[in-house]
Amino acid sequence: MPTHPAARTNSERQNWPREVKARAPQRIFLLSPANASGVRAKMIMSENARFVLARRLRNDGLPLGELFSFVSGLYFRGKLAYARAFASPPGGVPGILVITAGRGLVSPDALMTHDEMAEIADVPVDAGEARYREPLERDAQE
């Protein structure tokens, strides 16, 4: 049974004929931020944490999507999986961006270091907070 066209992966869509691509709906996903100051965030940020993700975060960094998937658990992981399956952006535009506190719109594939995650955790997710709102407004205008 063929899958619905919207469920096809981005790589499958790249092989479509030009006239089919022109009619295909375009979708960009903005994913809401994870709670970077919650229990799971504190767990991965702890200098005493010895599990693999915490060590990777401290050493080379983690992709934001992987980091927020751990911090938020199934909620963010599900949103990210859905966005990866159904994103269909116009050319030259990323299909998925994550709203981050203090950093604006960031690709889920961007590496985040321990220090960068600490900076994110320091900014409240609050539209009244300039450190949260201004980077988001800046990136939304680009």
Residue positions per predicted region:
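Peripheral peptide segments
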Residues: 2-142
